[in-house]
Regions:
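ASCE RecA-like P-loop NTPase motor cores
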Residues: 1-250
Length: 252
């Protein structure tokens, strides 16, 4: 109902007629509502001063837009530090980039919601990105899907997931008989995928603490985003081989 407020509609009409920049002065509490209204007619990139402000604004916008808004986090580390960014951060960044692609190129076969609004702190936007990351897609599994069970560990390893005996953190996966436990990079809980031969019969979430499935938390599909922004793709292997060959020709 708030989005149909006459005063808000007047602001939105002015915004739609603006040819260049438009400055809107409002109280802080009204900003999420105004942004949600603007998002009904055009995709938005909302820039905040800090990550904390960005996370808070994303939560407020979600009350109006649901899954149509996401926060684009920045790395917790500098590009040349030995420390790697957390798997959660990497997964969320790749998820946002993928969902932006879905907004431009809808895919009826993809169950993931496209984005209307991306919220990002200024720091997130000044960190350089590989151009190929915009085309990174998740590995999606769904109930009744048939997939070569023997190839699944290889696929997950290629997405920088680590095979372990017991899943405990994001990026882990374990194989026991016809069951595969995976902790997706962007998920709150890990998932347990049961196979009947090469067919997926069940997908359930489970708790890390006791490894038991969570009641009434069955899923019809699950998406695994990569755990690293640097993946050994075929193109990357060719470039590495070419670089190695070039370096072998250099004599010091």
């Amino acid at each position: 109902l708030a989005l149909h407020n006459p005063a808000l509609q007047e602001v939105l009409n002015d915004a739609s007629r603006a040819e260049r920049n438009l400055t809107i002065n409002s109280i802080d509490a009204a900003r999420p509502l105004i942004l949600a209204g603007l998002a009904t007619t055009t995709p938005l990139l909302v820039v905040t001063a800090t990550g904390h402000e960005g996370e808070e604004l994303t939560a407020e916008l979600a009350t109006y837009l649901g899954d149509g808004v996401a926060y684009f986090p920045s790395w917790e580390t500098l590009p040349h530090e030995r420390l790697s960014p957390s798997i959660d951060t990497v997964g969320r960044r790749l998820e946002v980039l993928h969902r932006l692609q879905l907004a431009d190129h809808p895919n009826k076969n993809c169950p993931i919601t496209p984005l209307r609004v991306v919220v990002a702190a200024a720091r997130s936007l000044i960190q350089p990105l590989q151009g190929s990351l915009a085309h990174t897609e998740p590995f999606i599994l769904h109930v009744d899907q048939e997939i070569d069970f023997a190839e699944l560990p290889t696929i997950l390893t290629g997405l920088s997931y680590e095979r372990v005996d017991l899943v405990a953190r994001r990026g882990d996966f374990a194989v026991r008989g016809g069951i595969v436990d995976i902790f997706p990079a962007t998920a709150e809980h890990p998932v347990r995928i049961e196979f009947w031969g090469d067919e997926i019969s069940d997908i359930r979430t489970f708790a890390v603490a006791d490894q038991r499935t969570i009641p009434d938390a069955d899923l019809t599909w699950v998406a695994m985003y990569p755990c690293s922004e640097l993946l050994m793709t075929e193109d990357m292997e060719h470039r590495a081989a070419k670089l190695s060959q070039d370096l072998s020709l250099i004599h010091i």
